[in-house]
Amino acid sequence: MAASAKRKQEEKHLKMLRDMTGLPHNRKCFDCDQRGPTYVNMTVGSFVCTSCSGSLRGLNPPHRVKSISMTTFTQQEIEFLQKHGNEVCKQIWLGLFDDRSSAIPDFRDPQKVKEFLQEKYEKKRWYVPPEQAKVVASVHASISGSSASSTSSTPEVKPLKSLLGDSAPTLHLNKGTPSQSPVVGRSQGQQQEKKQFDLLSDLGSDIFAAPAPQSTATANFANFAHFNSHAAQNSANADFANFDAFGQSSGSSNFGGFPTASHSPFQPQTTGGSAASVNANFAHFDNFPKSSSADFGTFNTSQSHQTASAVSKVSTNKAGLQTADKYAALANLDNIFSAGQGGDQGSGFGTTGKAPVGSVVSVPSQSSASSDKYAALAELDSVFSSAATSSNAYTSTSNASSNVFGTVPVVASAQTQPASSSVPAPFGATPSTNPFVAAAGPSVASSTNPFQTNARGATAATFGTASMSMPTGFGTPAPYSLPTSFSGSFQQPAFPAQAAFPQQTAFSQQPNGAGFAAFGQTKPVVTPFGQVAAAGVSSNPFMTGAPTGQFPTGSSSTNPFL
């Protein structure tokens, strides 16, 4: 009967122990928080797991651990467990433990678990006496509760008016007029921006009209009338397309000529009379590179001054043309080509000397300022398109005075061109068209080009290489070769040290002159203005004689230099 009573008491204690194990804070191991504790630490009164029970036995002093299901508990042990449990043990042994500052070890590592248990029980690092445990626990609870409420709960959202108070000023949106200062600043900025874009305002205006006086550098934007007009060069560059400014550096007006320093223009001596013409300086070769002893024959200084004065009248109204139209200077060029075309006196390049020297050139006066801007271009076009009557722009059929380079001397003395005719041959006249050589002997076919030669008719060349081994203009014989592009004369000493233009009286001169022989072969038919000539006449002013039929005869080129 005593055994049954003891058995009933043990069953009652076991039931009470299971009830304590079912409490929330006793459902986990006190040391490692593992669910389902199976042992009871009777030393401290806590519920632990199987692994922690073995560690607790290895401490110094070892803890007394009992199994919940395999042992029996006395009434005193049950009462001790009821007074303690995991919650009370936590307040005593982990009273000073801070979860945020103290590191919880990895309980999967047995060594770390053992070290943690030694700190906890042997060293009593976080130990709090039982009489103070409840007070410390309550303080920690209040601190943790306040911190938890401050961190976990979101603060209440309050309106802005509650923060500012009733005295806060009212905020009006889109109801008031904006201040005037931004408007003023914007208008000023627009004005400045407009000024910056004023440089494009002249694009729609006349580019040849005089612009309004402005002080900024953008006033002459896209104004081609003032392309070269600088303050210090108004006298030199005021006339647009004024071809008179080509040779003004040394005081002589040479169209296409080089300014001479100490030599007079290329003028052979004449027997008398006015030898100057309108374009005396056209194709002016006086500044050709030459040595100190090689001069182009004997020069006449008085005639050179007459020639310079005759052509210099073209630029006499240069100061007046500065205020005139920019293309008025083309009228000067037109007058050069078309002067004297109405009578029997020749045209620009072959004009005879019946009229006085100064009267040939018709210089535009101040009235050209009010003339049509493009009248000069129209007149220039009429020169090239008009039919040749008694003369054309390059030749003259007159029998009077002299050519552009002066008359050929009658006496066959030491001149640049030995004369073979008693009648002076004009520049481009029918007997001979070479400005440097008079006609001698029968001509194969007359050419109207001053720099043109006939086919197979050349016996001596003035400047280039002659075929048939005839002596050239500078006295140096050349081997027989058809004159091709830049062959012949450039292989010889172009300017020997002996006297230039030696006498070649033993040879008859070339009838029409082989000027510029080394520039290629002839084109047989076309004259400078499209007039078909004889079959043996070359149309290239810079080619020497060659057999005809090399090029088609039906060419209609109007280029005077092809």
From Swiss-Prot:
Pfam families: ArfGap. A zinc finger (C4-type) spans 29-52. The keyword NAD does not apply. Residues 11-135 form the Arf-GAP domain. The modification Phosphothreonine is found at T177. InterPro entries: Arf-GAP_FG-repeat_protein (IPR052248), ARFGAP/RecO (IPR037278), ArfGAP_dom (IPR001164), ArfGAP_dom_sf (IPR038508). The modification Phosphoserine is found at S167, S181, S362. It is found in: Nucleus; Cytoplasmic vesicle. Residues 145-193 are annotated as: Disordered. O-glycosylated. GO terms for cellular component: cell projection; cytoplasm; cytoplasmic vesicle; cytosol; intracellular membrane-bounded organelle; neuronal cell body; nuclear pore. Ubiquitously expressed. The keyword Zinc-finger applies. Glycans are attached at S367. PROSITE patterns: ARFGAP. Gene3D superfamilies: Arf GTPase activating protein (1.10.220.150), Longin domain (3.30.450.50). This is Arf-GAP domain and FG repeat-containing protein 1. It comes from Homo sapiens.
